[in-house]
């Protein structure tokens, strides 16, 4: 399914950086997506979307897992 999406699909290099930095980087590198910062323990919907990247952050606002399109 993700192969149908345009542009960069994942950002492993952003694990460990501040969520706001990751959000801006993702949107700059793939203008087709909207990056959304969410707490790492939050439960989101399971619908796959090519225009969304969830940026999961820990309690300190640091990216805790690889942001991916979906």
Regions found by a protein language model. Give the residues of each.
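Exposed, flexible binding/inhibitory loops of compact, secreted disulfide-stabilized domains
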Residues: 1-70
